[in-house]
Amino acid sequence: YLADTAGRCRIVVDDARLALAREPDQAFDLLIIDAFTGDSVPTHLLTREALALYGRKLTAEGILAVHISNRYLDFAPIVAALAAEGGWMALDGADRDVPEDFARLASRWLALTRSLDIAKRIYSTPTSPRWQWQPALPGPTAPVWTDDRTSVTEALFPNPAGVATTP
């Protein structure tokens, strides 16, 4: 699909944070992070320091889109806590048509921006009835991960889909 894009597209194969650090500040309108669906998650992409880097590289109206779909880990409170601490607005978008097949996973994204105008536009953009945006809230105990401290156990769903529990 990249070959068919009308825009200019450059692919960089490297550690995301190291490569992004070499890019000029305020050079991007959109950054997409899509690295959390699997069982091995790069937590260093969801830290205070990482969010500060993304903020420097995005334009004033830029959007950080984070694909957080995961069967066992709920990254929404983690990212929302980072956003709140860093002065970002965060919107949680999810496909409300959850698949019954355990092999499939509903799509869930967080959109972060520092622009109130952009946040309002995302929130009010008509989407399908299956897809809805709502404010992403960190909750009272959501941790702020840093380069020095992360713990995936803080992101565990209380009862992941498809995992048997005993009464």
What kind of region is each of these model predictions?
Residues 37-38, 69-73:
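Short "lid" loop at the C-terminus of a central beta-strand within the Rossmann-like core
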Residues 21-32:
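A short acidic, Gly/Pro-enriched loop at the edge of an enzyme's catalytic core
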Residues 1-22, 41, 77, 81, ...:
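Soluble small-group transferase modules, centered on the S-adenosyl donor enzyme superfamily
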Residues 37-46:
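Glycine/threonine-rich flexible loop motifs
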Residues 46-61:
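A short glycine-rich, Lys/Arg-flanked "PGG" loop and its adjoining helix->strand segment in the class I
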Residues 61-68:
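Conserved beta-strand signature within the Rossmann-like core of class I S-adenosyl-L-methionine
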Residues 32-33, 66:
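Redox-cofactor binding/interface segments in oxidoreductases and associated redox assembly factors
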